Every structure is written in structure tokens, then in C-alpha cells.
Amino acid sequence: MGEETLPLVKAVDMAKRYGDFIALHPLNVEVHAGEFFGVFGPNGADKSTFIKLLTGQLRASKGNIEVLGVNAREDPQKLKANIGIVPESESPPSFLTPAEFLEFVARLRGVDDIAEKVEYWLNWFGMEEKRDTMCKDLSKGQRQKVMLATAFIHKPKLLFLDEPFANLDPIYQRKCREWLLQHVKDGGTIFLCSHILEMAERMCNRMAIINHGKVLAAGTVKGLKIDPSETLEDVFIRLVGHSIEDAERFKDEGVKHSEEE
């Protein structure tokens, strides 16, 4: 990235604490326009905390967070109005149909040709026959398709995804993966949280591996390998199986821990 390019996401000394429990240790992160950045870790690694702090869903205990020039701690509502988010384990409103919810989001986002866009995304996700079914009566996979459609419908400049392919069958996983890669080629930027390492190799320009709220390493997939024969799974097991101190030498300038309190 050129030095003159300002990051779309910039967090300095960002941390989250609940009383004496540190959910996310202080860290710095930058994501620039056109990047597909991924955060990967085992279950319970606090990946979701990472993304919720950046998107204003949680308030950081400390640190400065700017996303698209908006201070996430001071104005989370303005921030959420300007990005796309697919949260983990969140369903569309049970009392709305997919068509109604898509229309609501499209109006909120100022989308042109709303009726046309709603039909396009219902068809794209194979949901045309469920367009007027109450969301509470949809399957988990169908509800996830609705959530993805609401994030895609306005083609946001910056898209945050937390385990986006949960409950999707392989056909729609692949279809969504191809759309996301094209979105980045068209100038979009994506911040992804997942435990599926295959997504890093297929999709990410850069990635970070975290565990117990600590960043163990960050960089390109190739750059994280200490030997060409290493697989990403080898890298993951090596890093997650070691302490944060042992992992220090694998860090990249993209994500770094701040000095801890």
C-alpha cells in the first residue's frame, strides 16, 4: 500500500476488559482500501470481540478506533450506518419476511431501485420462494442468507464478516466467496473473522492469528511460514500451541500488541 493512503480501519492500543478479565489485550491494527484482511483463531479466541470493537457493537475499554474516519468509541451509530456487517449468530427480525427486511435495509442504506435490488438478491440466494415467509420460520441456513443479502445489497465500501459461512451449504459458500473476491477487485475492503483456515489461503491478502485475546502473528500467508513445506494448518498449530512471547518474532507491522498495562 502507498504511504499516502490512509487506512480505512485504524485502532491504536485497542483493548477490552470485563473487570479483571482481559477479553482482548491491547493491540494496534490497520487495514487499507482494497485489502481482504482475516482474523483467525480457535473457538474462544475472542475473534468476535475483535470485530465488535471495530464496528461499534462493543465499546473498547481503552484505545483509539477510527473506521472510515469515524471514531468508533464516540459515534458507534454513525459508524454502523456506513459499513456492512454480518454478525456472528444474529438472525433477521422474526416478525419480518426476507423481502420486507431487505427492503427495510435498502431504504436505510439509500439504495437506488430498491424493488429491483431486493428481487435480485432474493434470487441470487435462491430465496425467491421464501420471500414472503416469516423469518422465524426459515432454516438457519436461510436466515444466514438473508443476513448476507442485507450486507451485500448496498455494496459497502467496507464489509465486516464474522463467521459468514456458518450454516451455508458448499454451493453458497463458494458463490459468496467468489462475490467477496470480486467485491475486493472492484475496490471494496473486507475484514473477516473465522476459524476456517482454508478461507485465509483462498481469500486473504493478510491475516492475523489470535488466541485468548492475544495476537500471535500477522502478515501474509506466505510470510507466516518459516519453511516452504509448512501448511497453514502447521503454522496455526505451531502458533496457537506456543505462548505469546514465543510468537513475537512472527509478527508483521499490520497488527501489533501495544505495551500491556
What are these regions (language model features)?
Residues 155:
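Conserved catalytic motifs of ABC-family nucleotide-binding domains
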Residues 159-163:
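Catalytic Walker B motif of ABC-type/P-loop ATPase nucleotide-binding domains
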